[in-house]
Amino acid sequence: MNNNDLFQASRRRFLAQLGGLTVAGMLGTSLLTPRRATAAQAATEAVISKEGILTGSHWGAIRATVKDGRFVAAKPFELDKYPSKMIAGLPDHVHNAARIRYPMVRVDWLRKRHLSDTSQRGDNRFVRVSWDEALDMFYEELERVQKTHGPSALLTASGWQSTGMFHNASGMLAKAIALHGNSVGTGGDYSTGAAQVILPRVVGSMEVYEQQTSWPLVLQNSKTIVLWGSDLLKNQQANWWCPDHDVYEYYEQLKAKVAAGEIEVISIDPVVTSTHEYLGREHVKHIAVNPQTDVPLQLALAHTLYSENLYDKNFLANYCVGFEQFLPYLLGEKDGQPKDAAWAEKLTGIDAETIRGLARQMAANRTQIIAGWCVQRMQHGEQWAWMIVVLAAMLGQIGLPGGGFGFGWHYNGAGTPGRKGVILSGFSGSTSIPPVHDNSDYKGYSSTIPIARFIDAILEPGKVINWNGKSVKLPPLKMCIFAGTNPFHRHQQINRIIEGWRKLETVIAIDNQWTSTCRFADIVLPATTQFERNDLDQYGNHSNRGIIAMKQVVPPQFEARNDFDIFRELCRRFNREEAFTEGLDEMGWLKRIWQEGVQQGKGRGVHLPAFNDFWNNKEYVEFDHPQMFVRHQAFREDPDLEPLGTPSGLIEIYSKTIADMNYDDCQGHPMWFEKIERSHGGPGSQKYPLHLQSVHPDFRLHSQLCESETLRQQYTVAGKEPVFISPKDASARGIRHGDVVRVFNVRGQVLAGAVVSDRYAPGVARIHEGAWYDPDKGGEPGALCKYGNPNVLTIDIGTSQLAQATSAHTTLVEIEKYNGTVEQVTAFNGPVEMVAQCEYVPASQVKS
């Protein structure tokens, strides 16, 4: 009997014994850490040592050092002048206690399959199985769900995954599942959900992910730069493709111009951001607006521009429609309340004369409005994005270098001049091959739903909601498959997620780290990291600086497999392997992608070397000829020949399309709507007075790299995720810097480490999103999160009936010093493995 047979026999014996064991008897005291490496792995580690291996990541390109088979150091790529501090944590991404090592199945699901006790999800008890077993169960569940329920019961989702044009989990998941059968699709995302729906209605394009005016033109022409909820310095560390970080050179130039008095920067934000601090507090005008009152401030600015005759009538007449319909609301002719500076002062906390002075300054010279994404991640977030456009239109500088508005300046190196080059293709999730189960009968349910409402679908199947002019009937989801994403990080109100999770029959997670999504899954499949495979990636995003080889740094760890191989093997089980792979392996795909780039380059006058020469010798190609660009310039120069993608072809200050939807929470023009909860005297603030921000983190990308102990040592407080709080709020609560505190509201509670900082206005607190969920009571709703995931506290409601996006920043909390027993954080340890599965059992001990 070989080791695998012993393994299977041991598992069968173990399952037979499950019924007679107590919990104490079943669980081992150790966490899932390897007792010894396999012989093959040990041999590999003994011989492999190498320096200077080139590869890429979301945090930048690196030269990796391998010693004794382990990835031990990451040095910045020599062309990256401004490397992110986060690359120090990349070796931990491969080697850490939270690494998924083997295929695992939740104990009770292994016993009862889809009839399991779903309340046990999250208790972290898993059984190790073989790859064949795991994939068989994966396939069998797909078959069962398609035959029993049909496509309306299955949802798949991906997210930020890893870099690489070929190894993208989202495309591979989509293609594999599409070859088997239809499923429920999703629209929107968690980053820009409100803005990406409203802006196409207003200016004809999504705006949020597009290139911005070139920084050299901004630095040359702008006199005033308004940072509205945008932290450039912090957020440009990580990009979708491998970043070159060239944009930081322009931040240095901006800092010099600000110090010299050539450009004035205004930061509209409740906190002193990293960008604000970098440019110098003494140089930046800070408008510390009360959270969630940005729209009243915008309306007051617009009112001042109009009442003081500072607005551009010609631009409104020739490039916009609907100002006349908006004006009665602005002036108070509809409701008797002019939206002037005196009115806004009571809501925003900004005195009326400061508001008027800001409007005058913006109108006096060339003004570039740089809008972030955090403000639209709140209830009625569409209104703020719409008003950004209205303000820019009233200023009349849209389409001029250094003027107008932009929503993507903090992302993907925006504003770095783009180079004439090639954009590689990748592994597509689409296929022309019909699925095995070609069933398009969704039984009256919608086939696509807004992603931020998928928990609603689980909890309230059949509920009808509005979404961007359509009626959506939420499908009765029974099975979810996640690859390259972590919904327990990105979705709001975790205790509500847990309630929904209990209604699902099967959850499958494919990842390389034991995130909370994996802990709450039934089948967990170990994927490789980008450092364990070969790939290609763009170097630079909007800059399109070049193409980089992503060389394998170390072999796949433990039993991890590439997503490509996982889904290839899954497809083999229903006779679609060839359709999935298209007859190519990893290197075959890289050569195809490269050759497609060669052909693309010929049409652009760009030469790429032969693949083998690139891969074996060059490893990097750099493109030339950076091109200057002005956002919306073509539209400004000729709106007839270059119309916007709106019904009128113009900027729609009033949208008849939206008005005709008859939504009470998003009407035909931008408006101020009170929030369901709001700090500084707003609804709910008497009981929970602090506004909680959950913005992008400084030391990770969402939840990626939270597993890095190297990085956590730089930012955690008392072993917890930090909560930032003002000195005034801390003093009032008897909280000192370094204290463990409890942050809580009606939705949940977390522990965090207090950081008392004067960068935060009174009434404002912050916990960065992406902190791993670590409940003290397994999968029980209402458990105390021992580490500090802010989505325990956030609210799961749509922004409005238009976008149905996340409202994460509509969140109030209270904070108190924690005097209870501080339990050890266990989020980063992996699951508790059943004793019988820790090692193979000798044949003499196996009973038939």
Curated annotation (Swiss-Prot):
Gene3D superfamilies: 2.40.40.20, 3.40.50.740, Dimethylsulfoxide Reductase, domain 2, Dimethylsulfoxide Reductase, domain 3. Mo-bis(molybdopterin guanine dinucleotide) binds at residue 191. Its EC number is 1.7.2.3. It is found in: Periplasm. Residues 1-39 form the signal peptide. Its main location: periplasm. Binds 1 molybdenum-bis(molybdopterin guanine dinucleotide) (Mo-bis-MGD) cofactor per subunit. Transmembrane segments: none annotated. It catalyses: trimethylamine + 2 Fe(III)-[cytochrome c] + H2O = trimethylamine N-oxide + 2 Fe(II)-[cytochrome c] + 3 H(+). Its cofactor is Mo-bis(molybdopterin guanine dinucleotide). SUPFAM superfamilies: ADC-like (SSF50692), Formate dehydrogenase/DMSO reductase, domains 1-3 (SSF53706). Keywords: Metal-binding, Molybdenum, Oxidoreductase, Periplasm, Signal. One of its GO terms (cellular component) is outer membrane-bounded periplasmic space. GO terms for biological process: anaerobic respiration. InterPro entries: Asp_de-COase-like_dom_sf (IPR009010), BisC (IPR006658), CT_DMSOR/BSOR/TMAOR (IPR041954), Molybdopterin_N (IPR041460), MoPterin_dinucl-bd_dom (IPR006657), Mopterin_OxRdtase (IPR006656), Mopterin_OxRdtase_prok_CS (IPR006655), Prok_Mopterin_Oxidored (IPR050612). It comes from the Bacteria. Predicted to be exported by the Tat system. The position of the signal peptide cleavage has not been experimentally proven. Reduces trimethylamine-N-oxide (TMAO) into trimethylamine; an anaerobic reaction coupled to energy-yielding reactions. Belongs to the prokaryotic molybdopterin-containing oxidoreductase family. This is Trimethylamine-N-oxide reductase 1. The gene is torA.
